[in-house]
Amino acid sequence: MFGRPKKSDNTKYYEILGVSKNASQDDLKKAYRKAAIKNHPDKGGDPEKFKELAQAYEVLSDPEKREIYDQYGEDALKEGMGGGGGHDPFDIFQSFFGGSPFGGGGSSRGRRQRRGEDVIHPLKVSLEDLYNGTSKKLSLSRNVICSKCKGKGSKSGASMKCPGCQGSGMKVSIRHLGPSMIQQMQHPCNECKGTGETINDKDRCSQCKGEKVVQEKKVLEVIVEKGMQNAQKITFPGEADEAPDTVTGDIVFVLQQKEHPKFKRKGDDLFVEHTLSLVESLCGFQFILTHLDGRQLLIKSLPGEVVKPDQFKAINDEGMPMYQRPFMKGKLYIHFSVEFPDSLNPEQCKALEGVLPPRTSVQLSDMELDECEETTLHDVNIEEEMRRKQAQEAYDEDEDMHGGAQRVQCAQQ
């Protein structure tokens, strides 16, 4: 009589996959798919971790092996009860994603799988979103391996070599460009869509119609952390379109910051413009600034302080939160401009001269004034003036070119 096997560790495989002991088969599949894609050696993952994931999934996805493992642990499987998890991890991965683990010349360890393309989505966010952090739920459609045929496209799992391309997936077309000149072009076979194989109409999978994949809607929650930057990427590994014999690519969201009407951001610092009246710049000011999180900041000058046009002032720790260091912030810079009155009457000028520093301009004698030519100042918009001059110069240059051509033509006649 055989004795009862000694009980050993029966939680390790669940921990490797990151699931609970009462996880369903669907939970196991999701956990294995996500972790296996992330740790696949073709994506720079850890080969040892990849092997452990395959071993854990192979045991827990088999009801008989899982029951033995739950009752007696890993040692019971190694001793032969129900068979151990000894298959090639690459075969398990390829079989899971719809490839044939035994076809095409042996173990998939010797064949590098093609990596699927990443799917890039722009994600518009406000400056408030980047300051406070937020989450956005987005519904996306993607291709997933057909669960009915396991990505084979047929009921029987069989396929035929495409007669159009002889299984290569590519066709060559020749184009005649002229005498003794031809152009040879290679393009995907239109009969098999570049797969190199075809499926008999009667044998096509009823669920995917022979396409090997079906469409699935999925909701992804994108977490925008405090302090993230414009153009920063948020990646969901292995969530792009699935395809047989292919390592699934990633879905990548690229943040696009919308322009803010008040604040400008430079790195971890914030900039805001504020206009003072002449009285405020000379005699002091105070105003309330509503920050990106709704707080009211009281901004005021020191007693007797004069703020000059184009001057900057800074407030420490009121800039943007630093990414992944949310309790540290940059600076808030305030750029001041001063609004001057259009004109002053004589009484106002006299009153100002009584309190402002004396004039620094040189007093000229009558004789010196007689020798000077008097000028008149007038207002001008310098940007418009420069644009007008450039347009006039371009017009004059065009006129010179056309006029010169006409003169040459006349001389030839």
Swiss-Prot record:
- Lipid-modified residues of type S-farnesyl cysteine are C410
- Membrane-crossing ranges are none
Residue ranges the record marks as coiled coil: none
Sites where Cysteine methyl ester occurs are at C410
Q: Where in the cell is it found?
A: Cell membrane
Q: What induces it?
A: By heat shock; weakly.
Q: Report residue numbers covered by any propeptide.
A: 411-413
| Domain annotation J: ranges | 10-75
One family name in Pfam for this protein: DnaJ_CXXCXGXG
ZnF region ranges: CR-type? 133-217
Disordered: region residues: 387-413
One biological process GO term for this chain? protein folding
Query: What UniProt keywords are attached to this protein's entry?
Result: Cell membrane, Chaperone, Lipoprotein, Membrane, Metal-binding, Methylation, Prenylation, Repeat, Stress response, Zinc, Zinc-finger
A GO MF label: Hsp70 protein binding
Q: How does it sit in the membrane?
A: Lipid-anchor
The record's section on HAMAP family has: DnaJ (MF_01152)
Q: What is this protein called?
A: DnaJ protein homolog
